[in-house]
């Protein structure tokens, strides 16, 4: 089964991607650093979940661009 992400993770990731679309890449480590600069998270786990979901969304976006 896949990983379940909470609303806060999905909402925050989508908001960050909308505001700063050019800051994120398919590299998780890079996205993790960018997320930590943009928002203050209460825990590393939450920061990593947001960065991971952003990485996932960027990958989907790139695949769609290639297919189009």
Swiss-Prot record:
Protein's name according to its UniProt entry: Small ribosomal subunit protein eS17
Gene Ontology terms describing biological process: translation
HAMAP family for the chain: Ribosomal_eS17 (MF_00511)
Annotated family: Belongs to the eukaryotic ribosomal protein eS17 family.
GO molecular-function terms, A-Z: structural constituent of ribosome
Gene3D superfamilies: Ribosomal protein S17e-like
GO cellular component, one term: ribonucleoprotein complex
Keywords from the named record: Ribonucleoprotein, Ribosomal protein
């Amino acid at each position: 089964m896949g990983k379940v992400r909470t609303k806060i993770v999905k909402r925050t990731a989508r908001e960050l991607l909308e505001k700063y679309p050019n800051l994120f890449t398919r590299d998780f480590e890079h996205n993790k650093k960018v997320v930590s600069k943009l928002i203050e998270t209460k825990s590393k786990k939450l920061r990593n979940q947001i960065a991971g979901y952003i990485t996932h969304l960027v990958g989907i976006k790139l695949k769609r661009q290639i297919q189009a």
